[in-house]
C-alpha cells in the first residue's frame, strides 16, 4: 500500500475536488480523520465492500494490478498493512511534544443488545485505540445522540457541537463510529498583534470584504510555481513537527484556473524539502475562522465506496455475524481558527452508521482565495485541508 502521507494527500485533494462541485465558499476537513474512519470500517467489512474501501489506500497503478488477486485471504492480509500504518501513526501522534495539543480520538457507540464480534472489537482497539461504548439506541435514541454529541464537544474543546443533528439517529441504529481530530498549535514565530491591520480580501475581481490581515517578514520555506503562476509557502509550528502550507495564485481569481493543473503527487513534490528553499518573505495572512460540516455518503459513493452505504450490498460480516448492518450516515464536521499566536483546528467524523517591502523579499499577500493544509512533517500526513475564499 501507499504511505499514509501519500494516501492522505490523495484523498484530501480528491475529496476537495468533489466537495467544491457543490460548495462555492470555504472548504475545510480532515483527510486523516476521514481516512481513520474508513480504516475502522474496512476492518469490519469483507468481499466487494472491503475491496472498494481498500482502493482508497492504493494508487491507481497498484489497484489495477491487485484487482487480479481479489482472493478474500489476500484482501485481509493486504488490509493489515493499512491498519498497522494507522497504529504506528496514532502512537507517534500521542507522543508529540507539549508545545501544542494534537489529539486524534476514535470511539464506537454500539446498541447494547446487538452482538459485535469480539475479534473486531479487539482489532479496532489494537489498531485504532478505539473502544466500544454500549448505548440504548432501541429505547433511547435521542438521549444516545445527545450523549455522543456531548462526547465530541468535550473532545474538541467545545468547537464542534451537534455532530449528529436531530433525527440522524433512530431506534434502528446499531453502531455509530466517531473519529475526532483536535489541534491547537503555536506558530514557531508568532505574528505581532500590533502589525495586524484591517484590509480588503478579494473574493473575486469585483467583491471584497474586510479582514484583519496579520503580517510578518521572516525566512520561510518557499517555492514559486512558474507554470501555474502561484506560490507555496510553509509556515512552521513550534518544534517543526507540523507546518501549514499555503498555495496562493498570483491572480485574484487564479485558484479556479489552476485547480485542474494540480495533482496530489505534485502537491507532495512541491512541498518536499528538496523542492522548497528558505527565502526572506513578507507574509500577509488573514486572521480567519472556518467551520464546516459535510454529509459524506454521496461524496464517498461518487469516489467508488458506495457498497458500504448500501443496505443490500454492504458486507459487514467482519464486524457482526448478524445480517443487515450497513453505514447509514458518514458525517464530518471541522473547525479552524488561524490567529497571530497560531492555529486551533478540530474535526469530527461520525458514521451512523502593513510591513514595507524590503528588497530581495518575496511577497506572499493572501488577500484573495488560496488553498491551505496542515501537515505532520514526519509522516507527511495531511491533518487538515481547506480553501479560504470567503471571510
UniProtKB/Swiss-Prot annotation:
UniProt key word Transferase: no
Site feature Reactive bond, where: 356-357
GO-annotated molecular function: cysteine-type endopeptidase inhibitor activity; protease binding; serine-type endopeptidase inhibitor activity
Biological process (GO), any one: response to UV
Gene Ontology CC terms, in alphabetical order: cytoplasm; cytosol; extracellular exosome; extracellular space; lysosomal lumen; nuclear speck; nucleoplasm
Pfam families linked: Serpin (PF00079)
Disulfide-bond pairs as recorded: none
Tissue expression as described in the entry: Skin specific.
TM region positions: none
Record keywords, A-Z: Cytoplasm, Protease inhibitor, Serine protease inhibitor
Domain of life per record: Eukaryota
Entries under SUPFAM superfamilies matching the protein: Serpins
Similarity remark: Belongs to the serpin family. Ov-serpin subfamily.
PANTHER family: SERINE PROTEASE INHIBITOR, SERPIN (PTHR11461), SERPIN B13 (PTHR11461:SF161)
Function statement: May play a role in the proliferation or differentiation of keratinocytes.
Protein name (Swiss-Prot/TrEMBL): Serpin B13
Gene: SERPINB13
Amino acid at each position: 500500500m501507499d504511505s499514509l502521507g501519500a494516501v492522505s494527500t490523495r484523498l484530501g485533494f480528491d475529496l476537495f475536488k468533489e466537495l467544491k462541485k457543490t460548495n462555492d465558499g470555504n472548504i475545510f476537513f480532515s483527510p486523516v480523520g476521514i481516512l481513520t474512519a474508513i480504516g475502522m470500517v474496512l476492518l469490519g467489512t469483507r468481499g466487494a465492500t472491503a475491496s472498494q474501501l481498500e482502493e482508497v489506500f492504493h494508487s491507481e497503478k497498484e489497484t489495477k494490478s491487485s484487482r487480479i488477486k481479489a482472493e478474500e485471504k489476500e484482501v485481509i492480509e493486504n488490509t493489515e498493512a493499512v491498519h498497522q500504518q494507522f497504529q504506528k501513526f496514532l502512537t507517534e501522534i500521542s507522543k508529540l511534544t507539549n508545545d501544542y495539543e494534537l489529539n486524534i480520538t476514535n470511539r464506537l457507540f454500539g446498541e447494547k443488545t446487538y452482538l459485535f464480534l469480539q475479534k473486531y472489537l479487539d482489532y479496532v482497539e489494537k489498531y485504532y485505540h478505539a473502544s466500544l461504548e454500549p448505548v440504548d439506541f432501541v429505547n433511547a435514541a435521542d438521549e444516545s445522540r445527545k450523549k455522543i454529541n456531548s462526547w465530541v464537544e468535550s473532545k474538541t474543546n467545545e468547537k464542534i457541537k451537534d455532530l449528529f443533528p436531530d433525527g440522524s439517529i433512530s431506534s434502528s441504529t446499531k453502531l455509530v463510529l466517531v473519529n475526532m481530530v483536535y489541534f491547537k498549535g503555536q506558530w514557531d514565530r508568532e505574528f505581532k498583534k500590533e502589525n495586524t491591520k484591517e484590509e480588503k480580501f478579494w473574493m473575486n475581481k469585483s467583491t471584497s470584504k474586510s479582514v484583519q490581515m496579520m503580517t510578518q517578514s521572516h525566512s520561510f520555506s518557499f517555492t514559486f510555481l512558474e507554470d501555474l503562476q502561484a506560490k507555496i509557502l510553509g509556515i512552521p509550528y513550534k518544534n517543526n513537527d507540523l507546518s501549514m502550507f499555503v498555495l496562493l495564485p498570483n491572480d485574484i481569481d487564479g485558484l479556479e484556473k489552476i485547480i485542474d493543473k494540480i495533482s496530489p503527487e505534485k502537491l507532495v513534490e512541491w512541498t518536499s524539502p528538496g523542492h522548497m528553499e528558505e527565502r526572506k518573505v513578507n507574509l500577509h495572512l488573514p486572521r480567519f475562522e472556518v467551520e464546516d460540516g459535510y454529509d459524506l455518503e454521496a461524496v464517498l459513493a461518487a469516489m467508488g465506496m458506495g457498497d458500504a452505504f448500501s443496505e443490500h450490498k454492504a458486507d459487514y460480516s467482519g464486524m457482526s455475524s448478524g445480517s443487515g448492518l450497513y453505514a447509514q450516515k458518514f458525517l464530518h464536521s471541522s473547525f479552524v481558527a488561524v490567529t497571530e499566536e497560531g492555529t486551533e483546528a478540530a474535526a469530527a467524523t461520525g458514521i451512523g452508521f502593513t510591513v514595507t517591502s524590503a528588497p530581495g523579499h518575496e511577497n506572499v499577500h493572501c488577500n484573495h482565495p488560496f488553498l491551505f493544509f496542515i501537515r505532520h512533517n514526519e509522516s507527511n500526513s495531511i491533518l487538515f485541508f481547506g480553501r479560504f475564499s470567503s471571510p
